[in-house]
């Protein structure tokens, strides 16, 4: 009898949300080239809409976006998918106030400063 081939482990799925489409697309390309299955969306609302169909292992989101902020998207993601890891990034000083409000509400998120160097991002995802 022959043994069934070992199942190929699936690539970790990463949902990238940023209203700057070039940044979202670039990060998704880098992740796809480095062993992840990544999808780019351009708003917090689209990130939430994509959860059921994409089933990400991780959400990477800009904090300051038009409409729903990255923190709001992260909180909604945690409620819907408690095992989904969250990593936020921002290039704006106003982020501190939003993060403090989230902490007061019981939410802790890791945040990286923009611009995010690809090697730093990959290290965070793999570490």
Walk through the language-model features, giving the residues of each.
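Non-catalytic signal-transmission and effector/linker regions of two-component phosphorelay proteins
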Residues: 1-13, 117-127
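Acidic catalytic/metal-coordinating carboxylates
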Residues: 42-46, 69-73
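Hydrophobic/aromatic residues positioned on beta-strands within the core alpha/beta folds
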Residues: 89-91
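Charged docking surfaces used in two-component/phosphorelay signaling
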Residues: 25-33
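The feature encodes the CheY-like receiver
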Residues: 24, 66
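The short loop immediately C-terminal to the conserved phospho-acceptor aspartate in CheY-like receiver
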Residues: 20, 63-64
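Short hydrophobic/Thr-rich beta-strand motif most characteristic of the beta2 strand and flanking loop
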Residues: 35-42, 50, 112
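Active-site beta3 strand of CheY-like receiver
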Residues: 54-60, 87
């Amino acid at each position: 009898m022959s043994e069934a081939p070992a199942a190929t482990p699936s690539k970790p799925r990463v949902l990238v949300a940023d209203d700057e489409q070039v940044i979202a697309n670039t990060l998704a390309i880098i992740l796809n080239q480095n062993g992840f299955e990544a999808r780019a969306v351009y708003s917090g609302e689209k990130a939430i809409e994509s959860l059921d169909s994409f089933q990400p292992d991780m959400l990477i989101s800009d904090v300051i976006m038009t409409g729903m902020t990255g923190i709001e998207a992260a909180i909604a993601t945690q409620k819907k998918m408690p095992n989904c890891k969250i990593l936020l990034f921002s290039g704006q000083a106003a982020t501190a106030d939003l993060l403090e409000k989230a902490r007061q509400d019981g939410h802790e998120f890791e945040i990286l400063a923009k611009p995010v160097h690809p090697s730093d991002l990959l290290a965070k995802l793999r570490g």
